[in-house]
Regions:
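Periodic small-residue-enriched repeat registers in elongated scaffold domains
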Residues: 1-77, 81
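C-terminal intramolecular chaperone/autoprocessing and neck/assembly modules of extracellular spikes
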Residues: 55-56, 61-159, 163
């Protein structure tokens, strides 16, 4: 393993390189060649996994990626994962991980969705040419009282509201 960048870290593993300033490389054949890179390489291949632009978070994990926020993979847990070979996150939604199930009034949900302001917008931190569409979190929270914060919309809540509105 090679450690060359100022304030860079290679905590262990094998065949790792952290040459960017403030970079991190761990696992196997991880190369953090640009400033601010974090790279984790699994042991699935001898080929390196590289960070090719500054300030990126790069992980090679052909066995999948699991982010658990409670429990463990063998029992009731909360979290998200990307299955091996998959392209998208899957949120835990197992009935056995839930409690206090309550029925909803799909027609009421539909009425609220129809009244929910929807706009196109861009993030202040993005190029203005990149557009998105959706409700503002504060409006969504006021209408449905779902999730952890009135400043965010969980995709699992947005999906549930959309499916309920379709049923309505």
């Amino acid at each position: 393993s090679v450690l060359c960048g100022l304030a860079s870290t290679v905590p262990g593993g094998s065949n790792n390189r952290a040459t960017g300033v403030g970079s991190f490389a761990a696992g196997f054949a991880a190369e953090a060649n640009f400033d601010g890179c974090f790279v984790w390489g699994d042991f699935s291949t001898d080929s390196p996994v590289r960070c090719n632009l500054a300030n990126r978070f790069v992980v090679r994990s052909v066995g999948g990626i699991y982010m658990l926020t409670s429990g463990n993979q063998e029992s009731n847990y909360a979290g998200t994962f990307i299955a091996p070979g998959a392209q998208a996150w899957t949120a835990t939604s197992d009935r056995n991980s839930k409690e206090r199930l309550q029925p909803i009034d799909a027609e009421d949900v539909l009425r609220k969705v129809v009244q929910l302001p929807i706009a196109t917008w861009n993030w202040k931190s993005q190029d203005p040419a990149i557009r998105h569409m959706g409700p503002m979190a504060q409006d969504f929270s006021a209408a449905f009282q779902l999730g952890e914060t009135p400043k965010g919309i969980s995709t699992i809540d947005a999906d549930g509201v959309a499916l309920a509105a379709i049923q309505g």
